[in-house]
Amino acid sequence: MSRILNFRAISNGALILLFLLLCHCSLVDAQALEPIGIFDHHQDVGNPKLKGSVVYDKENQTYTMAGAGKNMWATEDQFHFLWKKIKGDFIIRATIRFIGKGTADHRKIGIIARDNLNTDSRYADACVHGDILSSLQYRAKDGDSTYQVVVSSYHPTEIELERIGNTFTFSAAVFGEPYKSVSKEVALNEEVYAGLFICSHLEDVVEKAVFSNVQIIIPPPKNFVPYRDYIGSHLEIMDIETGHRKILHSAPNSLQAPNWTPDNKFLIFNSLSPKENLLYKYELATGAITKLNTGFANQNNNDHVLSYDGKMIAISNHVGEKRTSTIFMLPITGSDNPTKITSELNGHSYLHSWSPDNKKLVFTGQRNNEWNIVSVDIDTKKETILTEDATLDDGPECSPDGKYIYFNSVRTGTMQLWRMKPDGSDEEQVTFDEYNNWFPHFSPDGKWILYVAFPKDIDPTSHPFYKKIYLRLMPAAGGIPKTIGYVYGGQGTINVPSWSPDSKKIAFVSNSKLELGK
């Protein structure tokens, strides 16, 4: 009897101990996986002698990482890792900067995807060294040696790692330049640990680096149908001098084409839903979002523009069974009855600009079975066709001094920027590169032109959703454009003027499939 009691006592004690251990493990796991910014967790991999750390600056949306580790090479790795589990295709991008001169030339920072957290795991990464070396490093098998494909970008500040199936692409650039890229097939698990890393290359040294403009981008499924299926949106602002970006608002649906009000109080953007396409105001001081009343005009597209004095807004709204894009005008405070400016009987009208004197609107019009640049007198509603070209002309915008109308045209075979006098005379080409350039937008001070550059492999008559695009900046007086934005977006990113009143920042939309509630 005593033996039975002792056995039961031991069994009960063991069960209690097991229960306590399980509770402790669950508590530790819950604490360990506390998210940092957009990531799930951070930790050392490979048990480096000195421990690493991450500090997240919520206001500036930056990550300051510290880490040691012997190396990330040969058959095993030691580094500090800020990761998130990601399944399927993705893009992770970041702006990077080492802190200090460093000790070892081969200190490393970058973006990595690994099967697991073991020191010898298969992986592919976008690796930037302390010297001039930048390379896509990879380990094809657990415990195998490490190999690399070098990318010809020296001391890049802009990097991204993209996965499509088992193809990994490392793209790198110095801010202002376009990407240079290399790719490699590496068979990793469908779900990987992916994120940012730092390695000092010396076990007794801790290095530090700052990662900014960090985004995890999940593209749409391969079978998505444009203009029927949408992924999520980030409403962002950017400093044009530094390239620093900040996400102000994210939504799981399609947000498009922000305007920045001249009083510096609001961003106005359109939001798509199954029944209505409405305009909303984002208050910059508080982050509050309110609907802009457009009355019966509740099928707005992304072509809406503020008057130069900021008192009025003109919009493009789909009308009737044919959903003809038609231009209306209303006070910036909203209206139940917007004033119709163009007739749906004339064909589609997609607004892009006011004249500086606020007396005319300039738009892309479908007239006489062609798409050309058209102006309309607001008072008389009289239209003037300014270009008469059989190919597509689009995206017109008046220069602030009123001397030119800039637009984009595919008449040379690729979409390039052009300009003409306000009466349509003296057409001349402005850009001459390999990209498909859309939507020129003047800074309020008239010194700069911002536009979006689509890749060369698209249909030049289209400006599709969900592509890797550049936001480029060109002196209005002429000169070489520079790349200031490395963006996943396209349609809806900057279709309309989006400059801050002081000409120092821009607003735009980028895209990613987003998790609800995050």
Predicted regions span which residues?
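Generic recognition of cysteine residues
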Residues: 23-25, 127, 199, 398
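Sequence signature of WD/YWTD-type beta-propeller architectures
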Residues: 220-518
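Extracellular glycan-recognition regions
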Residues: 31-224
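Short beta-strand/loop turn elements enriched in aromatics
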Residues: 26-27, 61, 469-471
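Bacterial Sec-dependent N-terminal signal peptides
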Residues: 1-32
